[in-house]
């Protein structure tokens, strides 16, 4: 008799199911950042301990390296109205009196003013359509529909801003996760204290708990703190639907590892130190950049 079972090394989607009461989902950030909860799991014994996040410094050794993602979240959600729609019969865009809103979520910068976005509703964001944002501050021309229904758009900043990023600062809002329903009072609380390079559509949340003081304490122990870069994109927003996790394909994301960062990580590892990735984004960078020698 053949059992229809996966090898234990292969994970199913159901392996990740768990109950999380809504009342246990924090709607506002704790102050200070490093006073949040920390769960420690001993990978050898399976023992679980509950600590405060700042206690993490007690578990870091002098020869270790802490790898952080210094991406910065942009106010990537903008709402506008379709100004022109593409008329197939005429073969050109014509002015429309449509009043329904069109929402774009910027995911990935392709080049200069061309971005991959999520659009809703899709019927108001077809190739050839032109969307107006901020009563003439910026327009977006829908160029193409690509994998996953993403819209490739070209932005044209018309007034009050010098570039797309400046226009987003005027018009955009932070794309908070759907389980956060409270208004974000301070946008900097959705940034890590070491955020540097704008480009993410969501925060690398594991890093939100670090404070400058905690990072200084970690460095004082002799541990190196090394930045890499991953701009969080579509992969964060698309749900996993495949039953076998190995069949899930992640959307590509922009990453960068400088030569200095690679050298420091490799040196620490060669000397017996541990590589401690802050969150899945830093881990994905290292997994993607590693060669056959690790």
Q: What does each model-identified segment do?
A:
Residues 2-294:
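Surface-exposed, charge/polar-rich loops and edge strands
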């Amino acid at each position: 008799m053949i059992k229809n079972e996966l090898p234990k090394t292969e994970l199913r989607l159901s392996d990740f199911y768990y109950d999380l009461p809504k009342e246990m989902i924090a709607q506002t950030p704790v102050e200070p950042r490093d006073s949040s909860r920390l769960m420690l799991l001993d990978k050898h014994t399976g023992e679980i301990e509950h600590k405060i996040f700042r206690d993490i410094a007690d578990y870091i050794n002098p020869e270790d390296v802490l790898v952080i993602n210094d991406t910065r979240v942009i106010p990537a959600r903008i709402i506008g109205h379709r100004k022109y729609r593409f008329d197939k019969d005429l073969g050109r865009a014509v002015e429309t009196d449509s009043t329904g809103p069109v929402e774009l979520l910027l995911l990935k910068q392709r080049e200069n003013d061309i971005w991959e976005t999520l659009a809703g509703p899709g019927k108001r964001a077809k190739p050839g359509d032109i969307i107006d944002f901020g009563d003439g501050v910026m327009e977006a021309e829908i160029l193409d529909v690509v994998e996953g229904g993403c819209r490739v758009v070209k932005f044209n900043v018309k007034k009050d801003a010098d570039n797309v990023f400046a226009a987003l600062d005027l018009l955009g809002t932070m794309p908070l996760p759907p389980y956060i329903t409270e208004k974000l009072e301070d946008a900097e609380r959705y940034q890590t204290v070491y955020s540097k390079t704008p480009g993410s559509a969501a925060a690398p949340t594991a890093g939100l708990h670090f404070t400058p003081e905690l990072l200084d304490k970690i460095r004082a122990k002799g541990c190196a703190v090394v930045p890499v870069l991953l701009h969080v994109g579509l992969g964060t927003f698309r749900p996993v639907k495949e039953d076998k996790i190995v069949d899930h394909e992640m959307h590509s994301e922009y990453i960068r590892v400088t030569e200095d960062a690679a050298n420091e990580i490799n040196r620490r590892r060669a000397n017996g130190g541990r590589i401690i990735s802050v969150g899945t984004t830093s881990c994905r960078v290292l997994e993607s950049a590693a060669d056959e020698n690790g």
